[in-house]
From Swiss-Prot:
Keyword Nucleotidyltransferase: yes
EC number: 2.7.7.8
Catalytic activity, reaction form: RNA(n+1) + phosphate = RNA(n) + a ribonucleoside 5'-diphosphate
PANTHER family listed in its UniProt record: POLYRIBONUCLEOTIDE NUCLEOTIDYLTRANSFERASE (PTHR11252), POLYRIBONUCLEOTIDE NUCLEOTIDYLTRANSFERASE 1, MITOCHONDRIAL (PTHR11252:SF0)
Compartments, as annotated in UniProt: Cytoplasm
Function: Involved in mRNA degradation. Catalyzes the phosphorolysis of single-stranded polyribonucleotides processively in the 3'- to 5'-direction.
Family to which this protein belongs: Belongs to the polyribonucleotide nucleotidyltransferase family.
Domain S1 motif: 641-709
Name of the protein this chain belongs to: Polyribonucleotide nucleotidyltransferase
Length: 709
């Protein structure tokens, strides 16, 4: 057993080698403060897939005992991974997957388990560093890690100053959340979101982002060099591995180029994935038949290689893309708003052959998503939700729609990060759902655009519209081309997927995944400002659509906030919450109470119920002893048909509250008094103090009255 202790900004790391998980290809115990993680790497050397796909699985698992807790729920055992665990697994996967060589198709598993958590450490950063170290010292034959280690870093910002590797407390007060991973001078993965402050949405300018990125890059260079020097003695000898032979059969390639260039070019121009796949599949069988070649897989490899070569040559040499666009061109955009009559807000956003139907639903505090974090002692509430769905028919495939996958969770999280800071009404519960109806690249960014407009379509106030665009990259030798608004083909055959979302003032969220094994900051800078041009172009189109929005006023929930004396809040709640529950049931509203300030927020499906609840609450707290009297009322003693003479308690626009003989109040609705809506009840009953009433209906504490003629 050997220990290595390393000190970095806000990190005090200890790596233990030859101590745990020694049967694995690579295993280490990682500690930062009171947080302890186990990272292991395993591969099946005898099981190699014939497919080109790398069968790599990454699992980040939190053990509840790590923070002296029991698993919540009926079954007291860890089960289905939480959203945070899935997103952390994706973060590790997206960093480490590009490091595996072409042709490495052994089943490989990376597992990171949290065994102890002090409530302060950044578990995502800890998990990535632990996994990267376990992979580095393993016997997997990765040339990319021969002389370079991998590190992650999180950058926060407060009062204009950057914070490297902020604690969870510092991050909660930060204006920025930027996570970067890389090795030496190369960047592997970026995730970023702006955080709303008291001053507003706090979108980050491109210049400020590059400053933060430079800070991250300098940290990564220093950290990875230190890791390489310290970990190298513990690195195992790699097992034998024959890398994929990139050399193609020149004779077969010449045949394809000479005789089948035109049909391949035609297939490229079919921008729908299903059509292109069908045409290329038929062409492969045609070549096998006409050239009398038995190895169909070999033919497929050569046709796909030639197709990729054509796509990249068109971009690098002619600056023309497969669909005829220039490098900076955005696909045609069309937008329709509120096409769903009974959704609070809806938008159909179409960009080229990518289409997203985004709906928005507004709710109250009871609609918020309850969730737990490993470091939280009580349940937390999530009031802004974004759910992204990618049905198979969107790419022309026939398969069952099942449970939500990691990709859908990741795309939904990206869209949520992009939009959340722009929402001004943070107290409301808002759910956005993006249904991808057709996909040919950049569906997550279409969801961002549609989601921003869907918020406006249901009357939610936003700081600014948010647009998203996906950027691509094609490189060869010294040549480099950056693509705006990439299609599915360009994503597949390109070298980078770089998603940027934001408004006119700057960036609200970003995600970058690289396939090259690293990218320079110069290329990233160029892509960033090219994305800004596209974003502003898209925002102009979205502004035109926003100006034409017609709200679904009839179905939109209504809300109002008003103040009462803070010490009266307890009267609204009642013993065991009885009073507030009765008000909610009686008037069909949702109520949020702020004990310290005395703020009461009432939401209802219509104005009438809202005003009834507000009037009732104000009346409840206006006189001493009301609360006790209200709670003692025997509501079941009131029977339909009972008549009595009652004192008028209050006259409001929608009716008259009358004191009931055995406590409590009943309501005579205006419709039971007059059909003339122009008449004011206060004028009709100006000199009347008592009324002869009859009970028309009684439901719990809701008593409806009528006048006895």
């Amino acid at each position: 057993m050997q220990h290595i202790k390393l000190e970095f900004e806000n990190l005090s790391e200890q790596y233990s080698f030859n101590y745990v998980a020694q049967a694995a290809n690579g295993g280490i115990l990682y500690q930062n403060g009171g947080s302890v993680l186990l990272a292991s790497v395993c591969t099946q050397e005898n099981e190699k897939y014939d497919d080109e796909f790398l069968p790599l699985s990454v699992q980040y698992i939190e053990k509840t005992y790590a923070n002296n807790k029991f698993p919540s729920g009926f079954i007291k055992r860890e089960g289905k991974p939480s959203e945070f665990e899935i997103l952390t697994s994706r973060l590790i996967d997206r960093t480490l997957r590009p490091l595996f060589p072409k042709g490495y198709t052994y089943i490989t598993s990376i597992v990171v388990m949290v065994l102890s958590y002090d409530g302060k450490s950044d578990l995502q950063l800890n998990a990535l560093n632990a996994a990267a170290c376990a992979l580095y010292v393993s016997d997997l034959p990765l040339e990319s890690l021969q002389d370079k280690a991998v590190s992650g870093v999180r950058i926060g910002r407060k009062d204009g100053h950057f914070i490297i590797n902020p604690t969870m407390e510092q991050l909660s007060e930060s204006e920025l959340n930027l996570f970067v991973s890389g090795r030496d001078d190369e960047l592997l993965m970026i995730e970023m979101k702006s955080i709303r402050t008291a001053q507003g949405a706090n979108e980050l300018s491109e210049e400020n982002f590059l400053e933060a990125l430079e800070c991250a890059k300098n940290y990564i260079k220093n950290a990875t060099q230190t890791y390489h020097q310290q970990f190298a003695p513990y690195k195992k000898s790699p097992f034998a591995f024959e890398s994929a032979n990139d050399e193609l059969d020149e004779q077969l390639l010449n045949i394809i180029q000479t005789h089948y260039h035109t049909p391949i070019t035609e297939a490229i121009k079919h921008m729908a994935k299903s059509e292109r796949h069908t045409q290329l599949k038929a062409l492969i069988k045609q070549v096998v038949r006409e050239c009398e070649i038995e190895d169909e897989k070999k033919v497929q490899e050569h046709i796909m290689a030639y197709k990729r070569k054509l796509v990249r040559e068109m971009i690098l040499q002619s600056h023309i893309r497969a669909d005829g666009r220039g490098l900076k061109d955005v696909r045609p955009i069309s937008i329709q708003t509120n096409i769903l009559p009974f959704a609070h807000g809806s938008v159909l956003f179409t960009r080229g052959q990518t289409q997203a139907l985004v709906s928005a639903t507004i709710g109250g505090d009871n609609d918020a998503q309850n969730y737990e974090m490993l470091g939280s002692k009580n349940a937390l509430k999530k009031r802004f939700l974004f759910h992204y769905n990618f049905p198979s028919f969107s790419v022309g495939e026939a398969s069952m729609i099942g449970s939500v996958g990691r990709r859908e969770l990741g795309h939904g999280n990206l869209a949520k990060r992009a939009l959340h800071s722009s929402v001004q009404e943070q107290d409301k519960t808002i759910r956005l759902v993006s249904e991808i109806l057709e996909s040919n690249g950049s569906s997550s960014m279409a969801s961002v655009c549609g989601g921003s407009l869907a918020l406006c379509a249901c009357g939610i106030k936003v700081e600014s519209l948010i647009a998203g665009v996906a950027m691509g990259l094609v490189t060869q030798d010294e040549q480099c081309a950056i693509l705006t608004d990439i299609s599915g083909l360009e994503d597949h055959d390109g070298d980078m997927d770089f998603k940027v979302a934001g408004g006119y003032k700057g960036i609200s969220a970003m995600q970058m995944d690289i396939k090259l094994g690293g990218i320079t900051q110069e290329i990233l800078c160029q892509a960033l400002f090219q994305a800004k041009e596209a974003r502003e172009q898209i925002l102009a189109i979205m502004e035109e659509a926003r100006a034409k929005i017609v709200l679904n006023d009839v179905i939109l929930p209504k809300s109002e906030s008003f103040m009462i004396p803070p010490h009266k809040i307890v009267e609204v709640i009642g013993a065991g919450g009885r009073v507030i529950k009765d008000i909610i049931e009686r008037f069909e509203v949702s109520i949020d109470l702020a004990r310290e300030s005395g703020m009461v927020s009432v939401s209802a499906s219509n104005v009438e119920n809202l005003q009834k609840a507000k009037t009732f609450i104000l009346q409840l707290v206006s006189s001493a002893g009301t609360k006790k009297e209200y709670e003692k009322v025997d509501w079941e003693s009131y029977a339909v048909g009972e008549r009595f003479v009652g004192k008028i308690k209050k006259i409001v626009d929608f009716g008259i509250f009358v004191e009931l003989p055995r406590g409590g109040d009943g309501l005579i609705h205006i419709s039971k008094i007059t059909k003339d809506k122009t008449q004011q009840l206060s004028e009709i009953f100006h000199n009347v103090s008592e009324l002869e009433c009859e009970i028309l209906s009684q439901n719990k504490n809701k008593v409806e009255l009528g006048l006895v003629e």
